[in-house]
């Protein structure tokens, strides 16, 4: 009996030890028992790209003196001179090696919880339900705007009334930059109505725009916002109406005489004064639609605002056969491009349009720069101008060299997951430890160039933040694992990247992500007459504003994510979305210049005096069909896009678990 008691005692002792270890390593992190990496170091531990790491930095007991995630460390010596494919060897970071997730309970919780939740088929019935929910979300917001706000620009969804420019406070740029007293929400939503197949409402809305909207207004608006929201929507709707194939149903307008195109031209002419009297060719940020550039206007503008006009202005020029609009937009892009750093190839985020001096030296992927990169690539896709692709490729390489942190590969190896940080444009040194919600567009852009693996990892990071808060805070500090700016104005960028990643991989994981986003929006932002901005992502208090991009982008991308049979996917026409989510068909018509030569003062030459080769439409077709993007590998369909250990690692790094 004694030996039985001894054996029983040993068994109980072993079970007790297992229980203690499980509490420490399993529950510990979720209960906050471990020391999170952001609290263990400060900015004084940052080193210059050429400086050695401090051998004593970092928490006591950490092997190798690792002080935190490799995001805080500059790229390895020589990284700025070599492409991303060169191996990076960052420190393991607080998240440790690749099998760290297993140590913290990955195997001990039975079948993997990520596999359980996300992998496998997404039932067709559930998909249809989510599609209808997305459509209902749009209809609820749109109908309430028409009932309570039209013809004003926006809907105040809590008090069920309209909102226009703030005439009492001209300095209220958050409102006045966007609202021009031209029924903004109605105009911005036109092509969403078409994509959802609502021909009767689309036709009614177009007639309302033609009959009631005028740009002869004493409104001072931001050139960028008026271009992407209004000009882009008018051009998109015009192309839908005049498309001989009518893939979305009968969207034709009886006796339509190109009125939307003429309205787009009228608006663009009113924006042209922004490009006059600037010593650099970079436009003023704002114009008055009646009088032109205000006399007391600011000479400083952001790179994205000045350099993201080429798609809309280029489409307008090519439809009208008038090179003026594309010329001024392209001149601005070239002027900004020529101001990039000679050392890093990076651009800043704020520039003086008269001196060309960089006022804001931060280089990142978020506010102030985001759509500049986006439109370099999309301009090439639409117009086939080779120089646009060359600029984009050079910019993308600089981004990889100086902004990207973390391990080399998304889905293998040790170290922290990839992240793109904000750096000084001249030195490449880290400037701060936050990212903003606009940066969530970048995985979608990476999909367009075929860098799907990196897109998967970056998207997973933003999705982890969404899971933690049920929204994306406007600015999130990855060092402190907390929001720096707490509001969420119903932005679409994460949804956009989710949609594009699903199109690239057909992985049901992204349908689950879309469902999470839909349910969060319904739970936290739906109010009496629409969907409201979240004032505070933690306490979920709301603000009385529904921005127009909620209907033009957020609802549209959610709907398309779940509508597998939508003509966007099945009609055989290739479509591209503008930075405001307006749909544009990619066809040879836009790749043919209706004028003899462009930039005539350059004589058809580049700055080096060499003749510029413009690929012909048939050459572009070969170039653009040479990738394997149309073939989805089976492993992308039936397994998680990111290994569970890396998903868990990312969730840990944002404080989710």
Swiss-Prot record:
Question: Keywords assigned by UniProt?
Answer: Endoplasmic reticulum, Glycoprotein, Membrane, Signal-anchor, Transmembrane, Transmembrane helix, Unfolded protein response
Give the positions annotated as glycosylation sites. 181, 198, 299, 342, 624
InterPro entries linked: 6hp_glycosidase-like_sf, EDEM1/2/3, Glyco_hydro_47, Seven-hairpin_glycosidases
- List the ranges whose topology is Lumenal: 26-657
Name a Pfam family for this protein: Glyco_hydro_47
Instruction: Kindly state a single biological-process term from the GO annotations of this entry.
Output: ubiquitin-dependent protein catabolic process
Could you tell me where this protein is found in the cell? Answer: Endoplasmic reticulum membrane
Show the stretches that span the lipid bilayer: 5-25
Q: Which residues lie on this side of the membrane: Cytoplasmic?
A: 1-4
Q: Provide GO CC annotations from the record.
A: aggresome; endoplasmic reticulum; endoplasmic reticulum membrane; endoplasmic reticulum quality control compartment
Give the Gene Ontology MF terms in alphabetical order.
calcium ion binding; mannosyl-oligosaccharide 1,2-alpha-mannosidase activity; misfolded protein binding
What Gene3D superfamilies does this protein map onto? 1.50.10.10
Which N-terminal residues, if any, form the signal peptide?
A: none
Where do the segments described as Disordered lie? 48-94
Subunit structure, interactors included? Interacts with DNAJC10. Interacts with DERL2 and DERL3. Binds to SEL1L.
Family, similarity comment: Belongs to the glycosyl hydrolase 47 family.
The protein's job, in short, is: Extracts misfolded glycoproteins, but not glycoproteins undergoing productive folding, from the calnexin cycle. It is directly involved in endoplasmic reticulum-associated degradation (ERAD) and targets misfolded glycoproteins for degradation in an N-glycan-independent manner, probably by forming a complex with SEL1L. It has low mannosidase activity, catalyzing mannose trimming from Man8GlcNAc2 to Man7GlcNAc2.
**What is the name attached to this protein's record?**
ER degradation-enhancing alpha-mannosidase-like protein 1
- Name the source organism: Homo sapiens
Name the gene for this chain. Answer: EDEM1
């Amino acid at each position: 009996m004694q030996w039985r008691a001894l054996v029983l005692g040993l068994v109980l002792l072993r079970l007790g030890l297992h229980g203690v270890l499980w509490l420490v390593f399993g529950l510990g992190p979720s209960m906050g028992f471990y020391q999170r990496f952001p609290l263990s170091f400060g900015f004084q531990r940052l080193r210059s790209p050429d400086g050695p790491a401090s051998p004593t930095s970092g928490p006591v007991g950490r092997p190798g003196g690792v002080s935190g995630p490799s995001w805080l460390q500059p790229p390895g010596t020589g990284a700025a001179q070599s492409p991303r494919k060169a191996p990076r060897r960052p420190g393991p970071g607080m998240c440790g090696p690749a099998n760290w997730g297993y140590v913290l309970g990955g195997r001990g919780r039975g079948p993997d919880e990520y596999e359980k939740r996300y992998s496998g088929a997404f039932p067709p019935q559930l998909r249809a339900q989510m599609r209808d929910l997305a459509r209902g979300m749009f209809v609820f917001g749109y109908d309430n705007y028409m009932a309570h706000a039209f013809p004003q620009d926006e809907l105040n969804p809590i008090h069920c009334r309209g909102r226009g420019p703030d005439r009492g406070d001209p300095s209220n740029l958050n409102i006045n930059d966007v609202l021009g007293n031209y029924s903004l929400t109605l105009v911005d939503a036109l092509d969403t109505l078409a994509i959802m197949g609502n021909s009767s409402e689309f036709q009614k809305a177009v007639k309302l725009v033609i009959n009631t909207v005028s740009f002869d207004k004493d409104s001072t608006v931001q050139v960028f916002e008026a271009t992407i929201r209004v000009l882009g929507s008018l051009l998109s709707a015009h192309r839908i109406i005049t498309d001989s194939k009518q893939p979305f149903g009968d969207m034709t307008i009886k006796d339509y005489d190109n009125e939307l195109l003429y309205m787009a031209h009228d608006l663009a002419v009113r924006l042209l004064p922004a490009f006059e009297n600037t010593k650099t060719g970079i436009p003023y940020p704002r114009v008055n639609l009646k009088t032109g550039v205000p006399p007391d206007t600011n000479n400083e503008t952001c790179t994205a605002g000045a350099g993201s006009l080429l798609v809309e202005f280029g489409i307008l020029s090519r439809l009208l056969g008038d090179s003026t609009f594309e010329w001024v937009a392209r001149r601005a892009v070239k002027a900004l491009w020529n101001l990039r750093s000679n050392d890093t190839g990076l651009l800043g985020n704020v520039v003086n349009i008269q001196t060309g001096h960089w006022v804001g030296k931060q280089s990142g992927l978020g506010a102030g720069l985001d759509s500049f990169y986006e439109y370099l690539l999309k301009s090439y896709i639409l117009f086939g101008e080779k120089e646009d692709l060359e600029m984009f490729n050079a910019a993308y390489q600089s981004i990889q060299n100086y902004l990207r942190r973390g391990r080399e590969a998304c889905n293998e190896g040790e170290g922290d997951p990839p992240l793109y940080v904000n750096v000084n444009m001249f030195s490449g040194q880290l400037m701060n430890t936050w990212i903003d919600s606009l940066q969530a567009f970048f995985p979608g852009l990476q999909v367009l160039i075929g860098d799907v693996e990196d897109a998967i990892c970056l998207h997973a990071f933003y999705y982890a933040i969404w899971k933690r808060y049920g929204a994306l805070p406007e600015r999130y500090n990855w060092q402190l694992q907390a929001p720096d700016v707490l509001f969420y104005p119903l932005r679409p960028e994460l949804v956009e990247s989710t949609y594009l990643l699903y199109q690239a991989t057909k992985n049901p994981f992204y349908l689950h992500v879309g469902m999470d986003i839909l349910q969060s929006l319904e739970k936290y932002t739906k109010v009496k007459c629409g969907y409201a901005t979240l004032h505070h992502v933690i306490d979920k208090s709301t603000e009385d504003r529904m921005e127009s991009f909620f209907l033009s982008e957020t609802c549209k991308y959610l709907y398309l994510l779940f509508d597998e049979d939508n003509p966007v996917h099945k009609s055989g026409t290739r479509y591209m979305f503008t930075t405001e989510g307006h749909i544009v068909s990619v066809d040879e018509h836009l790749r043919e210049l209706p004028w003899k030569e462009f930039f005539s003062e350059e004589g058809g030459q580049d700055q080096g005096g060499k003749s510029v080769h413009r690929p012909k439409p048939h050459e572009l077709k070969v170039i653009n069909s040479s990738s394997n993007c149309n073939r989805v590998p089976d492993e992308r369909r039936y397994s998680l896009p990111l290994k569970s250990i890396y998903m868990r690692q990312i969730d840990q790094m944002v404080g989710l678990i």
